[in-house]
Amino acid sequence: RSLLNVLQEEKASRYAGGIYHKTQIELTYNSNHMEGSRLTHEQTRYIFETNTIGVENEVLNVDDVIETANHFRCIDLLIDKAKTALSEKLIKELHFILKTGTSDARKDWFAVGDYKKLPNEVGGRDTALPEEVSEQMRALLAKYNAKKSKTFKDILDFHVCFERIHPFQDGNG
């Protein structure tokens, strides 16, 4: 059995404690943490396992909770489409799922499920200008998809390039 088979089987059965369970919690916690979420690892786990929030004497950002729940759905979609070539359409669909229902979705200038409209930077580093994003993403995807089998280094290189382009206003992590 491949890792993908195990992930698909555990996803279908909602098996607790396996690689699917751990992947959902670890990827969601770490990705959201990089994007500034203040949810703890334990809160992320609790949301995944129970679809509820149990908090006393603590203020939570609603967007953190929404994006956490949405991130679980993004991972499920990636497992479902794992054998499909990575595309702009899929990347935009993931962004749409991630940001739906957040306060960003109510901003006129924020393009949920589409590339950024305004320039942005990451850690003081300039990113691709909005008018450059589409072309740079197409080039990145063409280079990545041209590889017959992807190594771990190929995946890391793709992610570094993706982060340098930073195609979305927010939610690029």
Show which residues each predicted segment covers:
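FIC/Doc superfamily catalytic core
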Residues: 1-172
